[in-house]
């Protein structure tokens, strides 16, 4: 309904047209602000979209930390959004971020993971939580008011993993469980149909994408069709073992800059210091 108020439509394809580039995204942020809405909840929301589209890994062959230009674009955009009031100054997983996804939220949208839609966003959308007797149905909060589009760039946000315990006495059983959950097409299709998550079967997801599958939470949208189209565009060629730690330290350091407590240069210095403390083998 916020999209309809700002853009005059809540059709996912038409909303995507309005958000298909970062320049267009910025223009919609301005339109949303004029209507009293925030474009994003907080500092971290768009981070993964930028960090997943870098030109090189965080660390080069000489163990030198390299801050990609695309990550600096996130810094500049987020500072602009903060100063102009286009975000709500929240951080991922905090109470403000969660509340912004609920019935009283005034945020245009959220960059989410496939698993986050059903495991997190759905729960946050309810006026009466399931544990308090509420039902996952239209009429409870803003259940049914959300929809999904691709946004300015394709990106990824982790996944759902299953690991075996080292030294298990049931190696064959564990193998069978893992293979069934992660490689059996019928099982994975059932997981998607039951949870709305996107699973590890290209052919299975394409079958659901072309079926009459729909999500009541997403207003009847077949979001698997969108994911099946978007997933092949994701590139993971620049991932490294340092990503988790360096991404966390970079976001943490930049938050002080966004809040106006330090300059950009000081925030960068603080990042390098924290990064090298975490990974002593790296250099600035």
Question: Predicted regions span which residues?
Answer:
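C-terminal lobe and pocket-closing loops
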Residues: 120-125, 152-252
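A generic structural signal for short hydrophobic patches within well-formed alpha-helices
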Residues: 1-3, 117, 187
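Solvent-exposed, amphipathic alpha-helical segments
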Residues: 5, 245, 249-260
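Bilobed periplasmic-binding protein-like "clamshell/Venus-flytrap" ligand-binding domains
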Residues: 33-43, 183-195, 277-284
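Helix-loop-helix "hinge/cap" segment bordering the ligand-binding cleft or interdomain interface
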Residues: 1-46, 59-92, 166-172, 262-266, ...
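Charged, glycine/proline-rich intrinsically disordered loops and linkers
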Residues: 5-17, 123-139, 211-217
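Extracytoplasmic/periplasmic substrate-binding proteins
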Residues: 46-54, 72-176
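Flexible glycine/proline-enriched surface loops and loop-helix/loop-strand junctions
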Residues: 7-12, 55-64, 157-162, 231-235
């Amino acid at each position: 309904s916020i999209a309809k108020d700002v853009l005059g439509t809540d059709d996912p394809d038409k909303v995507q047209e309005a958000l298909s580039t970062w320049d267009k995204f910025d223009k919609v942020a301005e339109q949303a602000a004029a209507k009293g809405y925030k474009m994003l909840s907080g500092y971290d929301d768009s981070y993964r979209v930028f960090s997943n589209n870098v030109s090189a890994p965080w660390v080069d062959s000489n163990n030198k930390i390299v801050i990609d230009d695309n990550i600096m674009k996130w810094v500049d955009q987020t500072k602009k959004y903060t100063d102009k009031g286009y975000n709500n100054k929240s951080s991922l997983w905090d109470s403000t971020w969660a509340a912004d996804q609920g019935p009283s939220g005034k945020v245009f949208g959220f960059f989410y993971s496939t698993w986050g839609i059903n495991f997190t966003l759905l729960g946050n959308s309810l006026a009466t939580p399931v544990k308090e007797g509420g039902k996952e149905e239209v009429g409870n909060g803003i259940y049914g008011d959300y929809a999904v589009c691709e946004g300015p760039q394709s990106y990824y946000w982790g996944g759902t993993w299953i690991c075996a315990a080292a030294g298990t006495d049931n190696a064959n059983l564990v193998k069978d469980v893992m293979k069934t959950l992660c490689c059996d097409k019928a099982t994975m299709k059932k997981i998607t149909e039951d949870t709305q998550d996107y699973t590890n079967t290209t052919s299975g997801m394409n079958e659901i994408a072309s079926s009459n599958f729909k999500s009541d939470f997403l207003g009847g949208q077949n979001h698997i069709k969108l994911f099946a189209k978007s997933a092949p565009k994701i590139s993971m060629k620049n991932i490294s073992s340092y990503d988790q730690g360096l991404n966390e330290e970079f976001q943490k350091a930049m938050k002080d800059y966004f809040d106006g407590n330090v300059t950009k240069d000081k925030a960068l210095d603080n990042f390098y210091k924290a990064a090298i403390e975490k990974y002593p083998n790296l250099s600035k």
